[in-house]
Amino acid sequence: MSTTPARTLDTEELEQRVKHMYQEVALEPEREFHFETGRALAERLGYPAADLDRIPAAAIDSFAGVGHFLDLADIAPGDAVLDLGSGSGMDSFLASLAAGPDGRVIGVDMTDEQLAKATRLAAEAGIENAEFRSGYIEEPPVEAASVNCVISNGVINLSPDKAAVFAAVAKALRPGGRLALADIVSTEQLPEGVTCDASLWAACIGGAMQRDRYREAIEGAGLQIVEWRENRVYRFVSERADNAVRKYGVTSISLLARHPE
């Protein structure tokens, strides 16, 4: 009796689709995507308008995050912060305000257009304590035990190797350091037809890990989850995404985890 071979995700196709998607977010943020972008989204998610007023507006235009978490990050003056999947820099710039002149923020992204935009905006705004590096979130180009806090917004779901991401987070954090993020997870395990569809991954659906497995991946890296909350105000804007939300409980969450002392 013959069996149908299991489908697998084409990770090269995934990378190209994700890069293309976020090239467009950087260059043409006014376009329609499978997800919301911009200042109205940021404010609805909970970003204070007064804070947004202090950073480059063009970075906010290309914001495509899924939740607010900087209150959990509790970034203090002098902190070193790593932003995984920093995009056009909105969260990095906000973190740089909290870290102050004695702190520093390192944003890491694999999309050249996002990196170029964030670097240009930092230079134009005179933001000297934020820099942006090309790299992958599974292997960010930072030294071990070099940061107080790792942040990420709507990006880890795009990685086909989330365990590697959380291992990299644990490696980068100093003892007692913090991981604060927003991401997409699911209540139910997504079927193969969804998890092997690179286009749905690029739309922040296909890579949504079942929430218990997501927690296990974090804890498996030696991090301790302190707080976990749902971002009920976040919504998808495509019909395919809405179907996944209804059928599999795909949702946005924010969390705080700590590296042991």
Which residues fall in each region the model found?
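Short alpha-helix
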Residues: G206-W228
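Conserved SAM-binding strand-loop segment of SAM-dependent methyltransferases
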Residues: A125-E138
